[in-house]
Amino acid sequence: MPKRTDIHKIMVIGSGPIIIGQAAEFDYSGTQACLALREEGYEVVLVNSNPATIMTDTTIADKVYIEPLTVESISRIIRQEYPDAILPTLGGQVGLNMALSLAKTGILDELNIELLGTRLSSIEQAEDREKFKELCKELGEPVPPSTTVNTVEEALEFGDRIGYPIIVRPAFTMGGTGGGICNNHEELAKIAKNGLELSPVTECLIEKSIAGYKEIEFEVMRDHDDNAMIVCCMENFDPVGIHTGDSIVFSPSQTLSDKEYQMLRDCSLRLIRALKIEGGCNVQLALDPNSFDYDVIEVNPRVSRSSALASKATGYPIAKMAAKIAIGMTLDEIKNPVTRTTYAEFEPALDYVVCKIPRWPFDKFSKADRTLSTQMKATGEVMAIGRTAEEAMQKAVRSLEIDEKDLYSETAHHASDEEIEQKLVKAQDDRLFYLAEAFRRGYSLEDVHELTKINFYFLDIVSHMVEMEKNIQENKDNLETLRLAKKYGFSDATIATLWNESIDQVRDLRKKNGIIPVYKMVDTCAAEFESKTPYFYSTYDGENESHKSGKKSVIVIGSGPIRIGQGVEFDYATVHCVKALQKMGYEAIVINSNPETVSTDFSISDKLYFEPLTLEDVLNVCDLEKPEGVIVQFGGQTSINLAAGLKDHGIKILGTSVKDLNRAEDRELFDQIIKKLKLNQPKGLTATTHEGVIKAAEELGYPVLVRPSYVLGGKAMEIVYNKSELEEYLHDHVDIAADHPILVDDYLDGRECDVDAICDGQDVLLPGIMEHIEHAGVHSGDSMAVYPPQNFTDEVKDKIMDVTRKLALTLNCVGIMNIQFIVRNGEVYVIEVNPRASRTVPFLSKITGIEMAQVATRVIMGESLAQQGYSDGLAPEPEMISVKAPVFSFSKLADVDSYLGPEMKSTGEVMGSDHTFAKALYKAFAGAKMQLPENGNVLLTIEDKDKEKILPIAKRFARIGYRIFATKGTADFLKNNGLHVDLVTKVHESENADDNILNELREGRIDLVINTMGHDIEKNSDGFIIRQMAIQQNVPLLTALDTADALLTSLENRSFATDALK
């Protein structure tokens, strides 16, 4: 059926900020969908609250609204735009839930707006646990024994009757939010309560656990004419019981017999047809490893995280096809963009193995509960492609950018046998390394299978790699062993360690003997048809399929997996760098390892290499492509860290030189520049021993800011207020050495700001100054920020510009750089310089209209700012005011303290823009899901040092009609200052009393918590327990008084003043 001509304007709802369970894959799918609809001639209106994405670029849709994803906000846009239809199935769970909410308000019926793609009834049938179970019964498809509950009592009755373990799955949530495996009555009571609170419809499915079964996923497509096909089959390394987003995944499936595959394939096709889904969907199935019995776990009636992985694994662009199906086209009339000759109905065939490994945030959150279960905890993922499962897995491990570069872990090596067995039984993020260690110690496949229930085939892969380690070690400099090692994915670095040689010695031996990788094309059809995709992976098997084009080329290094501190913002900058290079006539080549992002869409760059971002893997591509040079400024710290190694091997680094990058990043060299330029800086000292750090802190005087050098996202950065806190910090965090010194800074309390500058060696363009709303001490990534700044005089702005210019020119910056300042009493202090793009680039680019990454790329390639039409200095400020607000994923990470400090904790961001600061704040808070009633109850739990500061804030809350609740110390202080306060008892006082602080939160009597008890970071401290309870109960929580002040500004502008005349 040809595309529909009765609709012309389509609204696409995006997925909002990045949180755990909903990451950059929806930027990728949303971008693809918008472009596909425009390609077919439709006018596209996009609504999304996330400024960090490519999706919210003005080139992606005809109209782009960066507005809160609330019913109120979207309804307003609908009445303004009058779209003919809405496409909600590409914005993750947020988009789906928003479509359901809009439908319930009646606005879609009132304005005769159609929902495209999968019908609402189908979405409800797939998402509503009880309706889905009934459908499976009708189809004769098996599901685990289960019941749907709306109360904790119902859950406990079922659990006690059917027996444990039990799995809790809340309805209409994402990433397993609120769910879990319960082994007894007490665990079920706790998890069911949490799950019911987090489900928007207060409903959970309680089912008998089938943990230990194989977990298989099918990505399925169906069109209006009932054509249906399988895009990809994926198999989880981990058995059922660990969320698929936290599982290692292989594609194609590795252990299914043809009979099992056909049986599960048929089941998936029956389900998508029965649900009448139009577009893409993800079917999760559990297979008993000892029989042909299987159970249906769930169906996601939309594009998902697995769809992005399947798209990159096969080269088949699922979101693009789903968008075209939504407008009435059928699979047999849509061309496959990879081959450009076959049609979309052909099922992809793979002649390689893909391995995905999740990237978890536990390097940031060392005290978090690392146990993996049915609730997702990973922030991102990496993907690697190889000819064997071993090669794919080894490449994926080294793509993770963690301490382990292969299957050897120093921590696992020093663990006792008892600790290793505990790690195998209770899955955590590092279980893979303990599996390898168990095999090194002689555990049999049977022993390890008994402890883990992981399939023998996957255990054999790990065991084989451990055997190969031994083989490599015993055959030093043997060429056959070297060939075999490379075939199975061993890196030069691992081989060098096993041979006790340098990496360059292994590399030289390999190259001298012609042991070099070939690059194979990802073509969707196992080379059956000619393919046009410039999408490649390396292997040491067969013929090379990637050839130099003859055009001048530039390699752009991506930013790797999404993690806290290095998010989708860097992918945004990478994509814009590619666009600028293409406009200048260069062949733009991307190297990246992240399957979720737009930069790894093969249609974005001229050539895509899906490779780990290690020196060896990047050099191999450089050896083949012989580029004009490599750009490292847009891939975050990942690419910057590769610059020196690339230069040492003769590769030209374009833009700021490696020497100057080092001058900005090395503390002592940077201090010399500050002194030479006579600039202000917080006093700081460097130490290389524990004793040296303590001495430095005493010399500067507490509080001090401590951190390692060369880090991103404030990793291991803390404000410490006394010697005992400093000793605990040193014990918890840090390996100190001469080449890894610790920086100790005097902590300055002032107003922080961020600038991104572009310098061509002569002129310096400052697109904007972003003022942080929180005072210094909260990491810039966790601060709310406003542009244009609201509290800086022209004199301060001039000083910032002057200092920026001096630093950019002295550091010989060519391209982009980021500087963070503290403004105190009209003086400007330099905190740090990052000689690369920062996470604020997308936000500033969108609100200033200056495509910063593109302008910087042109500068890097030799085009001056003047030639591009920009002059030296601060760019003119727009009339609109924009606020950026961070978004956190604390509900997914038990035991992570939500108190904000210098170490970054946010996973995403939203933006609010309007003509006044108060309205922009309101939108930013709404986008971050902090919508408060005009009057309600606020709980204040405040440190003594903040008591004076809380008084004006408390008075303002009282004035707009909020009731104030506080514990005795704060309550007495506020009462003495004339305020009415409701007293609550402390955490450990009369715990069962109705007015105990935790009971007040549990019973839903509190609308907002302001808690500044931050230094007490112990898990049993009152401050920590209150913060955890607020997050569990989904109560808005603020830990900085500046944020409370901003929230009040927003609330006051919604409330009427009620002042007596006298």
Curated annotation (Swiss-Prot):
Domain ATP-grasp positions: 133-327, 671-861
Chain sites annotated for binding Mn(2+) 1: 284, 298
Catalytic activity reported: hydrogencarbonate + L-glutamine + 2 ATP + H2O = carbamoyl phosphate + L-glutamate + 2 ADP + phosphate + 2 H(+)
UniProt key word Amino-acid biosynthesis: yes
Binding-site residues, Mn(2+) 3: 820, 832
Enzyme Commission designation: 6.3.4.16, 6.3.5.5
GO cellular component: cytoplasm
Pfam families xref list: CPSase_L_D2, CPSase_L_D3, MGS
InterPro entries in alphabetical order: ATP-grasp, ATP_grasp_subdomain_1, CarbamoylP_synth_lsu, CarbamoylP_synth_lsu_oligo, CarbamoylP_synth_lsu_oligo_sf, CbamoylP_synth_lsu-like_ATP-bd, CbamoylP_synth_lsu_CPSase_dom, MGS-like_dom
Cofactor(s) needed for function: Mg(2+); Mn(2+)
Gene Ontology MF annotations: ATP binding; carbamoyl-phosphate synthase (ammonia) activity; carbamoyl-phosphate synthase (glutamine-hydrolyzing) activity; metal ion binding
Annotated family: Belongs to the CarB family.
Subunit field text: Composed of two chains; the small (or glutamine) chain promotes the hydrolysis of glutamine to ammonia, which is used by the large (or ammonia) chain to synthesize carbamoyl phosphate. Tetramer of heterodimers (alpha,beta)4.
Domain notes: The large subunit is composed of 2 ATP-grasp domains that are involved in binding the 2 ATP molecules needed for carbamoyl phosphate synthesis. The N-terminal ATP-grasp domain (referred to as the carboxyphosphate synthetic component) catalyzes the ATP-dependent phosphorylation of hydrogencarbonate to carboxyphosphate and the subsequent nucleophilic attack by ammonia to form a carbamate intermediate.
Purpose of the protein: Large subunit of the glutamine-dependent carbamoyl phosphate synthetase (CPSase). CPSase catalyzes the formation of carbamoyl phosphate from the ammonia moiety of glutamine, carbonate, and phosphate donated by ATP, constituting the first step of 2 biosynthetic pathways, one leading to arginine and/or urea and the other to pyrimidine nucleotides.
Protein name per the record: Carbamoyl phosphate synthase large chain
